[in-house]
């Protein structure tokens, strides 16, 4: 059995660890609320631009059809935008979305896909794709706690341009959707080509005045819509990250508290045994006299 001094040292070490995890839990809770606010603030813009894109894409103003709306007869070349975190200590968040991405890539390979290109948002996903030997054409890391579209759109645009130029037949995005504080869901969604289901049904019949012309307006609107989808995915993932980290750190703090209690019990028993032994020795010595 360990000595009382060794047990006290262990208790002190676990107490220090608990202080750290408790502080990280509180920081994550604060960041989670801010991330949720950003996520909710982005939703009205994404919904409004979706409605405009739906109306414009189905308006009979021109025979022109944007590349983002063209469905390919056969999908042989696939792009994947993988959204993960830059840091760990967030439970199984990254592991779950990486598993979804890996299963998707295996499925595409089994269906005869000849090429898979990846764009990684987040350090964890970038490292994962490198370990898997995937073809990573672009990546962005260290987005910080406040994602900016200007920083992430460069790497994402490489993927969008590849689709628009006919180098890819479909583009998917994998991220963790925020459900609530205790639940986050890893999802894989088709980003391109845009489907009628994704855009939704136009609200009535719309007539617009186009400046300078319909093609320019449609081109710009659809690109902005896809960018909004990517930003929303990143915002959802960041809210999920902070929620998962808060829960993970709370679990770590609770476990540390239990360990401290168990060690304290062992220490008390050790101290009691030592006192009993000393008393026995004193009594034995007195009896001998």
From Swiss-Prot:
Keyword Membrane listed: yes
UniProt keyword annotation of Transcription present: no
A single GO BP: proton motive force-driven plasma membrane ATP synthesis
The protein's assembly and partners: F-type ATPases have 2 components, CF(1) - the catalytic core - and CF(0) - the membrane proton channel. CF(1) has five subunits: alpha(3), beta(3), gamma(1), delta(1), epsilon(1). CF(0) has three main subunits: a, b and c.
HAMAP family the record matches: ATP_synth_gamma_bact
Biological role: Produces ATP from ADP in the presence of a proton gradient across the membrane. The gamma chain is believed to be important in regulating ATPase activity and the flow of protons through the CF(0) complex.
Protein's recorded name: ATP synthase gamma chain
